[in-house]
C-alpha cells in the first residue's frame, strides 16, 4: 500500500468506533495522515442487553481488537438515555401518528454529531471527530464548509446526514468517503484488521435481525382494521397501519384474490381516520404516484438554503435516483416541491434531501403529497 505523508501531526481526532470495517479503516487512514487518533465506542441501547438480538457486546469486542491492533486507546460512553429521549421516543411518536420516520437520521443529528461531539470536546479534548460515513467535506476559500456525496455512489450516506450544520461538518472528518467500499475492505484486510470481512449492519440499529412487527408490537398496541381497494372493496385485514408503508408489497396477506389480475398488490395510501389500509395493483398505480410534496422542518447545511424557484435534485428515500424538481417557499419553514416527472411511493414522515450536483444542501420532513 502507498504510504501517506503525515500532514496533521498533533491534531487530535476521536473516531466513532462501531466495531465495523468503515470506522476501523477510518482510524487507520487518519493515523497515516499524522493525526493523534483515539477511539470512542458508543452504547446507545440497553433494552436488549441480555437478548439474542443485541450485538453491542460483540461490536465492542471487535472495536477493542481493532484499536489494540492499531495501538490506540478506546474509550466507551453510554448514550442510552439520550438515545431513548431524542431518537426512540420520536420514532414511536411518528409511527403512532401514522407516519414512517427515519431514526438513523435522528441518531446522526442527536447522538453521533451532537452528544458524541460534545463528549469528545469536553471530556477528550478533541480537535475533530471522525465517523465511517461515506460522505466528503469540502473546505472553500471563503471559509465555508460543504458536505459532498461519497465517491461510492452505492454507499453514499449524505441522505442520512443532511441535518448537520456546516460547523459540525467542519469539525468532522470522513476518510472513507473518498473511497469505494471494496477499497475499504481491501485496506482492512491488508492491515490485518478482524473487521475486514464483517457483514455491514442493515436496518434499524435497535431492532437488529428480529421482525419489525414483533419489535414494534412490544411498544405500541396493535390496532387492527380493514384493507380496502381504492374503490372501497374490503379485501382483507391488517394488524396496524404502523406496520405498513407506502409502496410496500410484501406481508399484506392478500395474494391470490379472486377477480383481480396477476399484478402484485401495493400499499397506495393510509386512511388514518378510518384506520384503513388502501392497496392497489401495480407499482405505478395512480394512487401511489405523486407530482410533488410539501416539506417542513427544513434544515440547510449552510443555514441559508437554495433560492426560491430554483431547479435542483431531491431524494425522497435512500439510494433513490436523483429526482429533478422545482422548489417554492410557502414560508420560511415549508417548501412546496414539484417533480419534473411523477414519483412513486413518496412517504410522509420520511426525509426529502436536496442536492446541487455533488453538494448536499440539506432537507426536511415530507408532510403532504401533491397528486394530479
Curated annotation (Swiss-Prot):
Matching entries from Gene3D superfamilies are given as: Adenine nucleotide alpha hydrolases-like domains, HUPs, Translation factors
**Which cysteines are disulphide-bonded?**
107-205
What cellular component terms from Gene Ontology apply here? cytoplasm
Q: Does the keyword Disulfide bond apply?
A: yes
Location comes to:
Cytoplasm
Report keywords, A-Z: ATP-binding, Cytoplasm, Disulfide bond, Nucleotide-binding, RNA-binding, Transferase, tRNA processing, tRNA-binding
Query: For the site Interaction with tRNA, which positions are given?
Result: 133, 350
- Kindly identify the residues recorded as the active site: 107 (nucleophile), 205 (cysteine persulfide intermediate)
Fetch the SUPFAM superfamilies from UniProt. Answer: Adenine nucleotide alpha hydrolases-like
EC class: transferase
**Pfam families from the UniProt entry:** tRNA_Me_trans, tRNA_Me_trans_C, tRNA_Me_trans_M
Annotated residues for binding of ATP: 16-23, 42, 132
**Single GO MF annotation:** ATP binding
Catalysed reaction equations from the record: S-sulfanyl-L-cysteinyl-[protein] + uridine(34) in tRNA + AH2 + ATP = 2-thiouridine(34) in tRNA + L-cysteinyl-[protein] + A + AMP + diphosphate + H(+)
Q: Which stretches does the entry tag as region Interaction with tRNA?
A: 155-157, 317-318
Cited CDD domains: MnmA_TRMU-like
Q: Where is this region: Interaction with target base in tRNA?
A: 102-104
What family does this chain come from, according to its entry? Belongs to the MnmA/TRMU family.
Its biological function?
Catalyzes the 2-thiolation of uridine at the wobble position (U34) of tRNA, leading to the formation of s(2)U34.
What's the protein name?
A: tRNA-specific 2-thiouridylase MnmA
Which gene is transcribed and translated to give this protein?
mnmA
